């Protein structure tokens, strides 16, 4: 899970970038005539990242003009368990070429340099704003319609099984028992059987659409979806379900790992989002169509809880970022077991 950041109020001298990163940054800045000194860069760490270290880099310009800015992303340790970095970079480049994200300005051994988008990273409360939520719905529909290279095959179930294998390898016997990892393969099989539908809509999904991965231009109100580490083809109902689950999160509090499921969107809010989503580029959806998608989305929240629960366990063992991954995992699994009986009642005999 990656996050768009907010600036920390710190002295930049506390944060030293590797030499190869500085050299790459200086090479980029030397191409800009308005930069006074390519070596006079300011490093501002961005708060909230849980997979990578992210920094805003600024240079002063002549005649007191606006600073030149770029974004540096240093990849987190152990993330190759979650996704293939080369696949993610290819997705990033594809998105850039098709106007769906920042430009790739440079690469170095364990990271890259991106265009700094002059837009605001959304906050948790923005997701509840009807106007902003509607814009997210339409942008999401566009995203799902992207024709990406490769087979149009859902990867959700393979990813769940692969992450479960990693969990079993990394977790202590006590952790495995606490999280009931011994029954998880059976749960994944049951979910796939209950949720899979030959007629379901498969699209290119972000799979991590929380507020920190959404930016909005304050003037045009245009929405940009960023950070594609987990992006792949999947049921679109799953991607929407995951977005709804993220409304229970606020990663910029003193307890960023705590989820508040009282903030999960109500039926009317979910229906409004889905109607906007389905209306974009299509005819007005019937009530029956909206109801069907709503039911599918609700069931796919179970897959969201499982996958991010597994992610939390793995991250505890491979990631050094200051975040209570185990408590986060516990909450996601708890929500899975709590909601499963109600959500699968109608399909348990499928």
Curated annotation (Swiss-Prot):
Residues binding ATP, per UniProt: 73, 210, 227
Pathway of action: Phospholipid metabolism; phosphatidylcholine biosynthesis; phosphocholine from choline: step 1/1
Any one GO molecular-function label of the UniProt entry: ATP binding
Extent of the signal sequence: none
Catalyzed reactions per annotation: choline + ATP = phosphocholine + ADP + H(+)
Keyword annotations of the record: ATP-binding, Kinase, Lipid biosynthesis, Lipid metabolism, Nucleotide-binding, Phospholipid biosynthesis, Phospholipid metabolism, Transferase
Keyword Transmembrane included in the entry's annotation: no
A Pfam family recorded for this sequence: Choline_kinase
Induction of the gene: By wounding, and salt and osmotic stresses.
UniProt EC number: 2.7.1.32
Statement: the UniProt record of this protein carries the keyword Hydrolase: no
InterPro entries the record matches: Kinase-like_dom_sf (IPR011009)
Role played: Involved in phospholipid biosynthesis. Catalyzes the first step in phosphatidylcholine biosynthesis.
Family indicated by similarity: Belongs to the choline/ethanolamine kinase family.
Protein name: Probable choline kinase 2
Species name: Arabidopsis thaliana
Organismal lineage: Eukaryota, Viridiplantae, Streptophyta, Embryophyta, Tracheophyta
């Amino acid at each position: 899970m990656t996050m768009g950041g907010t600036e920390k109020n710190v002295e930049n001298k506390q944060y030293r970038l590797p030499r190869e990163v500085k050299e790459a940054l200086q090479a980029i800045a030397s191409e800009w005539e308005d930069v006074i000194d390519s070596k006079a860069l300011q490093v501002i760490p961005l708060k909230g990242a849980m997979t990578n270290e992210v920094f805003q880099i600024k240079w002063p310009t002549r005649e007191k003009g606006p600073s030149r800015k770029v974004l540096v992303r240093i990849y987190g340790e152990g993330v190759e368990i979650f996704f293939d970095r080369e696949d993610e970079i290819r997705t990033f480049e594809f998105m850039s070429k098709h106007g769906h994200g920042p430009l790739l300005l440079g690469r170095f051994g364990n990271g890259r340099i991106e265009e700094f988008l002059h837009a605001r990273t959304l906050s948790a409360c923005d997701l509840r704003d009807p106007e902003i939520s509607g814009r997210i719905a339409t942008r999401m529909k566009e995203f799902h319609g992207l024709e990406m290279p490769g087979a149009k095959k859902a990867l959700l179930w393979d990813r769940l099984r692969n992450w479960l294998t990693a969990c079993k390898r990394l977790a202590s016997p006590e952790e495995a028992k606490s999280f009931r990892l011994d029954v998880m393969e059976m749960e994944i099989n049951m979910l796939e059987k209950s949720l899979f539908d030959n007629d379901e809509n498969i699209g290119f999904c972000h799979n991590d659409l929380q507020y920190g991965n959404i930016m909005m231009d304050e003037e045009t109100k245009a929405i940009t979806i960023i950070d594609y580490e987990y992006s792949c083809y999947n049921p679109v109902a799953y991607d929407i379900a995951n977005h709804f689950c993220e409304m229970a999160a606020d990663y910029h509090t003193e307890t960023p790992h705590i989820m508040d499921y009282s903030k999960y969107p109500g039926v009317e809010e979910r229906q409004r989002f889905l109607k906007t989503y389905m209306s974009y580029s299509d005819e007005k959806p019937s009530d029956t169509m909206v109801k069907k998608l709503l039911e599918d989305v609700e069931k796919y929240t179970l897959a969201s809880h499982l996958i991010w629960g597994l992610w939390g366990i793995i991250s505890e063992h491979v990631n050094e970022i200051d975040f209570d991954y185990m408590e986060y995992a516990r909450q996601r699994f708890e929500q899975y077991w709590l909601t499963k009986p109600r959500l699968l009642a109608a399909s348990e005999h499928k």
